[in-house]
């Protein structure tokens, strides 16, 4: 069972403790291996590189707000399955045939360090591990496990991350409308946020209306998250290649930074309203969301170390 917030513990400290529990669980899922097992080594290094862990953190916070009654190991398995999926998608996104990135999470990308073939195989290995984790979750009835697997597979597939990356590769240089950009942003970013919250809702036996409202929240949160990422494209502390959006039709490039920041705030306000209905008795996600975006929107300050 997920406990509530502890009295006297700052939100920042609590997030750090939760993130450490996620990192520890990930390390256990991908133990250190013989240096000759290059694919397993690439999987572990890709996952264990310093990351924000936003997705698994949100899952733990959502479990608190939704009054999840299962075990913490099961919840961590579900959360880490999503993080493995996210990391696999980053490995593929960074490939020379796609974004051709050299830096990720402050370190050389997987294909730069291990080669392209290893990066592809490592991403497949991570996806396999992710689905296996959910399928083997002992605390959940079989029907719920199947629903959770379906949520994640749909988010990853040809109507999810795959389509989003295809559009980003082929349409980003075009003069896209704002709606077209928003659609691609949802597929690239928002759809995995939606899937992970649905997985927590399934594990928490939440009502259909709650799940529907969480989906609406994820739509707005994902758009805000992508806008923040685009606004920080040239920021030196992202741990990624800088100015990768030059020449692309992002909302920031199309509307300007000030208008994009205003659009971001509108998405946060809308997401907050959805949370009021989805989690009326819990405020863990809401507090995290406002802390996270508030600090970054204020002055791009790196002071908030949950970044």
Swiss-Prot record:
Cofactor: how and how many bound: Binds 2 Mg(2+) ions per subunit.
Pathway the protein takes part in: Isoprenoid biosynthesis; geranylgeranyl diphosphate biosynthesis; geranylgeranyl diphosphate from farnesyl diphosphate and isopentenyl diphosphate: step 1/1
Binding site for (2E,6E)-farnesyl diphosphate: 104, 188-189, 226
Keyword terms of this UniProt record: Carotenoid biosynthesis, Isoprene biosynthesis, Magnesium, Metal-binding, Transferase
Pfam families named among the record's database cross-references: polyprenyl_synt
Superkingdom per UniProt: Bacteria
GO molecular function terms attached to this record: geranylgeranyl diphosphate synthase activity; metal ion binding
Catalytic activity reported: isopentenyl diphosphate + (2E,6E)-farnesyl diphosphate = (2E,6E,10E)-geranylgeranyl diphosphate + diphosphate
Keyword Zinc-finger (UniProt): no
Cofactors that this protein relies on: Mg(2+)
Binding site for Mg(2+) 1: 93, 99
Family: Belongs to the FPP/GGPP synthase family.
PANTHER family in UniProt: FARNESYL DIPHOSPHATE SYNTHASE
Record-given protein name: Geranylgeranyl diphosphate synthase
Native organism taxonomy: Bacteria, Pseudomonadati, Pseudomonadota, Gammaproteobacteria, Enterobacterales
